[in-house]
Amino acid sequence: REVIVMSFSCPHCGNRNSEVQMAGEIQPKGCIYTVHVTTKQDMNRQIVKSEFCSVTVPELQLQIPARAGQITTIEGILQDTVRDLEMGQPVRKHMQPDVYEKIEALCERIRGLLGEETDASHPVQPFKVVLDDPSGNSFVEYTGSIESSGGADAKWSKRDYPRTKEQNVALGLMGDAAAENGGGFSKDEGE
C-alpha cells in the first residue's frame, strides 16, 4: 500500500502532528480489524488508519468516527481520544454540567484501560478495539509469524467485506444518483 506521511513538529510549543493520506487506490473490499488487548505490548501495535476508518471500543461503548488518517498505536488512539474529549471540559463544566460529568467519566474509564507505565508483558484490563475501514486501506500490526505453525496471532483478526452503495458513494466510487437508481460502477463489479 502506498501512503503519504505528513509530519509537523513545532520546536517552540512542542506541538506534534502526523497525518497519513492514502496515495494508492481504494481496495476492492472494506475491512474490519479486531484486536483483543490484554497486555501493554498489545497497546503498542502499530496502526495505519485511513481517513475513512472508524474505531470502536465496545467495552466503553465508544465509537470514534472517521477523521484524518494517521500512523499510531492502540495506546495512541486512546490517548488522542482523552485529549480531544478534555479539550472543551473547562467551559463545559459551567455550561453543561451533566455532559461534563459524562465525558469526565468516559475519560476516567479510558485512562483505566491505558493503565500505568509498566512492563510490556504486564496484563492490562482486557478490551477489544475494532477498526472498520470501507476503503480497505487501514492496517493493524500482526505480531504472529505467518511461516511458523505455532506463531499465529490469536488476538488479531481481519475480515474483508463488500461495501454498501452508501459506502461507495462516500468513497467517491459511485455518484448519489447512481446509488439511488441501484446502478453505477463499484470496484467490486468491475473486476
Predicted regions and their residues:
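Short functional micro-motifs and their immediate structural scaffolds
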Residues: 18
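Long C-terminal interaction/binding lobes of large macromolecular proteins
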Residues: 6-15, 23-191
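Short, flexible, mixed-charge glycine/proline-rich loop motifs
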Residues: 1-4
